């Protein structure tokens, strides 16, 4: 398996009132092509910060992040912006959709910006919205839809450019069980189509659907468990039990 994301000795420090807060400490890991990796850990362990930093949304303090052969730390703002637009997809807890645009236009905009033909982009956006059961929200503004609908719209937007990697921070956190299942079904479908996924979640059941889980505590990776591809949903309960036992051993 070739590597799409290679992280070495990554550190992230915030300075607050002249005090240093070392949120990430010498983090190293790899994400392979078509691999689905989840990061778990207690609240405040640095999970979301890790996701933002390795995706170039937040600057690293030191270390190396290599995305598909390019060192993020050496890219200009313009180069990094283009890379995020065309090769990365994002589902973050605070997605900054444009308030003046309807849901459909928010979803399709990244495809237009990436140079996709408008007819193709419109067709793809409509297909994604139908699959995730939010086509009725197409002309609604973002303040006119539920949190669950907005989260599914974020997934549509993340998928529209068929990115190399999707970075997802609690993608099912605001959803009911049906909507959560729909989101995970689409993420797994994208992953089987060779898109790599790096996800943060507190849900053991959701994490058990991934190939590998990293355990983050106090800004450091304390261990990993390899679950392999989820080939049959009937095996999910056993995967969930194995993962839960592994997490408990680490103080979960």
Report each predicted region and the residues it spans.
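Conserved signature/switch motifs of ABC ATPase nucleotide-binding domains
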Residues: 140-143, 160-161, 193
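Conserved ABC transporter NBD signature motif
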Residues: 63-71
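Helix-to-loop junction immediately C-terminal to a conserved catalytic motif
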Residues: 55
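The feature captures the beta-strand-to-loop junction immediately N-terminal to the Walker
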Residues: 40-42
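Short coil-to-helix segment of the ABC ATPase nucleotide-binding domain corresponding to the Q-loop/switch region
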Residues: 101-109
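Conserved ABC ATPase signature
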Residues: 141-145, 149-151
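Catalytic Walker B motif of ABC-type/P-loop ATPase nucleotide-binding domains
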Residues: 166-169
């Amino acid at each position: 398996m070739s590597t799409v994301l290679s992280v070495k000795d990554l550190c992230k420090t915030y300075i607050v009132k002249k005090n240093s807060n070392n949120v990430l400490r010498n983090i190293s890991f790899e994400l392979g092509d078509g691999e689905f990796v989840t990061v778990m850990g207690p609240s405040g362990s640095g999970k979301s910060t890790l996701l933002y930093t390795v995706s170039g949304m937040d600057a690293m303090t030191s270390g190396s992040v290599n995305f598909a052969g390019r060192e993020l730390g050496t890219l200009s703002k313009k180069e990094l912006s283009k890379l995020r637009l065309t090769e990365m997809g994002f589902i973050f807890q605070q997605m900054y959709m444009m308030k003046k645009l309807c849901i459909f236009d928010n979803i399709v905009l990244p495809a237009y910006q990436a140079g996709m033909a408008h007819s193709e982009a419109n067709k793809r956006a409509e297909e994604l919205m139908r699959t995730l059961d939010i086509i009725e929200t197409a002309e609604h503004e973002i303040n006119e839809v539920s949190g669950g609908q907005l989260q599914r719209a974020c997934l549509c937007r993340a998928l529209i450019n068929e990115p190399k990697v999707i970075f997802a921070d609690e993608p099912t956190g605001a959803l009911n069980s049906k909507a959560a299942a729909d989101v995970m079904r689409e993420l797994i479908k994208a992953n089987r189509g060779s898109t790599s996924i790096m996800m943060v979640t507190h849900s053991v059941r959701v994490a058990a659907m991934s190939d590998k889980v990293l355990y983050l505590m106090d800004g450091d990776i304390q261990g990993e468990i390899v679950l392999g591809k989820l080939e049959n949903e009937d095996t999910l309960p056993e995967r969930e039990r194995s993962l839960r036992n592994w997490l408990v051993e680490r103080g979960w």
